[in-house]
UniProtKB/Swiss-Prot annotation:
Location, primary (coarse class): cytoplasm
GO cellular component: cytoplasm
Gene designation per UniProt: metXA
AB hydrolase-1 domain mapped to chain residues: 51-340
General function of this protein: Transfers an acetyl group from acetyl-CoA to L-homoserine, forming acetyl-L-homoserine.
Keyword Protease: no
Disulphide bridges, residue numbers: none
UniProt keyword annotations, A-Z: Acyltransferase, Amino-acid biosynthesis, Cytoplasm, Methionine biosynthesis, Transferase
Binding sites annotated in the UniProt record for substrate: R216, D336
Subunit: Homodimer.
Protein name: Homoserine O-acetyltransferase
Record InterPro entries: AB_hydrolase_1, AB_hydrolase_fold, HAT_MetX-like
Subcellular localization, as worded in the UniProt entry: Cytoplasm
Length: 357
C-alpha cells in the first residue's frame, strides 16, 4: 500500500531541489504561495553556457531520466555528460519532489490533496523556466520529450522561443483530441469509483489503490498496440492469484500493482487533466495559424503504431510549422515505443543534435 512517506522514499538521492518563495500564479489564476522543484543534472555547463539539454518527462515519470531513458545516457550517446549539461525536472503537479497534490499546503499544514489547483502544460513549462533562470541558464540547445513531455516541448517553443535553440517532440500532438480526453476521463472515473477516493480527500495511509490500478490497466491498453499484444500474449493462459488467467490479464494486473507502489491518485487526476487541457492555440489564435507562427527548428517523431497520438497529428505539426521535419519510428509497440526502441530513438536525437552544431 502506497503512502506519502513511501513516495518520498522514491525520490532518488541524486535529486536536487530548488525552492522559490515567490508566489506562482497558474494559467487559470490560482496561487501557489511557494514552489519546490525536484531536478537532476548530468554534466557541466561549458564556458558560455550553450550546451544545455532539457528533457521533459511523461505522465508517471520523474526527474530520473537516466533511469527511464537509461540507454540515452553515456559517452557517445545523445545525452553525453562529457559534452552536454543535461537537466530534467519533475513537473509541477507530480509526486516525485516537485510541488503537487502530495505536497504540504502552507495554508493548512496538510497535503494539498484534492485542493491542488487545476494546472496546465504551460504552468509546467513556466515552472521549469523559473528553475533554469535561477540556475543562471539563458540558452537551451535542445528541449526534448515524449508524450506529456512532447507537449511541454511544444509549449517551450511558444512561451520561450528566445531561450530554446531547437525542439524535439515525440509521440505528441498540438492539442489533446477527443479520443485522448475520453481515455483520460475513463481512467479518472475508475479512480473516482474506488470506495477510498472520498472526493480526493483520502487518508494517506488508505489511498484509492484499486481505482488507480484499474486506471493504469486501462492506460496500458492504449500505450501498446493490437499487434504487440497479440504477438506477445495471444490467448495464452497462466496461473494467477485468482486462478487461471489469460496472460494479458496477468500482465495488466502486474502493471496496476506496480503503479500503486510508486504513484498517487490525486497526482494522476491532476496530470491527466493538464494533458486534456493541452492546446497550443488556447488564447493565441486559430490553431493552424498558431502552428505556422512557430519559428524554431523542430523535429517531430511519429510512432506508426501509436493509437493515442496517430501519425496524422504529427504530420499536421510538421506540415504547418515552417521549420519542422518529421521522423517515423516504424515499430509495433504503440505509444510506448519511445521507451522500448531506445537505441533507435537515441540515434535520432544524436543525429538532430549533430545538425545543430
Amino acid at each position: 500500500m502506497m503512502c506519502m512517506k513511501a513516495l518520498e522514499a522514491l525520490v532518488s538521492p541524486q535529486t536536487l531541489f530548488y525552492t522559490s518563495n515567490e508566489p506562482f500564479i497558474t494559467e487559470f489564476g490560482a496561487t501557489l504561495p511557494e514552489l519546490q522543484v525536484a531536478y537532476r543534472m548530468w554534466g557541466r555547463l561549458n564556458a558560455d553556457k550553450s550546451n544545455v539539454i532539457v528533457i521533459c518527462h511523461a505522465l508517471t515519470g520523474s526527474a530520473d531520466a537516466d533511469d527511464w531513458w537509461e540507454g540515452m545516457f553515456g559517452t557517445g550517446k545523445a545525452f553525453d555528460p562529457s559534452e552536454y549539461c543535461i537537466i530534467c525536472s519533475n513537473v509541477l503537479g507530480s509526486c516525485y519532489g516537485t510541488t503537487g497534490p502530495t505536497s504540504p499546503n502552507p495554508a493548512t499544514g496538510n497535503r494539498y490533496g484534492a485542493d491542488f489547483p487545476l494546472i496546465t502544460i504551460r504552468d509546467m513549462v513556466r515552472v521549469q523556466h523559473r528553475l533554469l533562470t535561477a540556475l543562471g541558464i539563458e540558452r537551451i540547445k535542445l528541449v526534448v520529450g515524449a508524450s506529456l513531455g512532447g507537449m511541454q516541448v511544444l509549449e517551450w517553443g511558444f512561451l520561450y522561443p528566445e531561450m530554446a535553440q531547437a525542439l524535439m517532440a515525440m509521440g505528441a500532438s498540438g492539442r489533446h483530441s477527443a479520443w485522448c480526453i475520453g481515455q483520460s476521463e475513463a481512467q479518472r472515473q475508475a479512480i473516482y469509483a474506488d470506495r477510498h477516493w472520498n472526493g480526493g480527500s483520502y487518508a494517506p495511509e488508505q489511498p484509492p489503490n484499486h481505482g488507480l490500478a484499474a486506471a493504469r490497466m486501462m492506460a496500458m491498453c492504449s500505450y501498446r498496440s493490437f499487434e504487440n499484444y497479440q504477438e506477445r500474449f495471444g490467448r495464452t493462459m497462466q496461473q494467477g492469484r485468482q486462478g487461471a488467467l489469460f496472460s494479458i490479464e496477468s500482465y495488466l494486473h502486474h502493471q496496476g500493482r506496480k503503479l500503486v507502489e510508486r504513484f498517487d491518485a490525486n497526482t494522476y487526476v491532476t496530470l491527466t487533466k493538464a494533458m486534456d487541457m493541452h492546446d497550443v492555440a488556447r488564447g493565441r489564435g486559430e490553431y493552424e495559424e498558431v502552428l505556422r507562427s512557430m519559428t524554431l527548428p523542430i523535429e517531430v517523431l511519429s510512432i506508426n503504431s501509436d493509437i493515442l497520438y496517430p501519425m496524422e497529428e504529427q504530420e499536421e505539426l510538421a506540415e504547418l510549422m515552417p521549420n519542422a521535419s518529421i521522423l517515423y519510428l516504424d515499430e509495433p509497440y504503440g505509444h510506448d515505443a519511445f521507451l522500448i526502441e531506445v537505441e533507435k530513438v537515441n540515434q535520432m536525437v544524436n543525429d538532430f543534435l549533430n545538425k545543430l552544431e
